[in-house]
Design a protein with these regions (language model features):
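Eukaryotic intrinsically disordered, low-complexity regulatory linkers and tails enriched in Ser/Thr/Pro
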Residues: 1-96
Length: 96
């Protein structure tokens, strides 16, 4: 089962000015090995440096996804508790 989250994507180089956009991403919860608070994105959002119209109260999480011998990290909207709840939500089909 895949879970839909909203990822914060950075484009551009640090020297020329970093720009950010949002996109939907589908994650397999069975491959997530860690979720932690991402304070830098929260600070950038409070300064108005992220996507226009994004609520300044949003919190962000960095998710580490297992890729076998390595991992990949993405930043998503939501505090670690909320993201963890979404990732652990299971839909079961009862057979009678």
């Amino acid at each position: 089962m895949l879970v839909k989250l909203t990822e914060v994507c950075g484009t551009g180089a640090v020297t020329t000015g970093r720009r950010y956009s949002l996109r939907e991403v589908f994650v397999n919860p069975e491959h997530v090995v860690m979720v932690r608070e991402e304070h830098q994105m929260k600070n950038l959002n409070e300064q108005g440096m992220l996507t226009e119209g994004l609520d300044k109260k949003h919190r962000f999480s960095k998710i580490t996804i297992d890729k076998g011998t390595t991992g990949t990290e993405i930043i998503v909207i939501g505090d670690p508790n909320t993201v963890g709840t979404v990732l652990n939500k299971r839909n079961y089909v009862l057979k009678g």
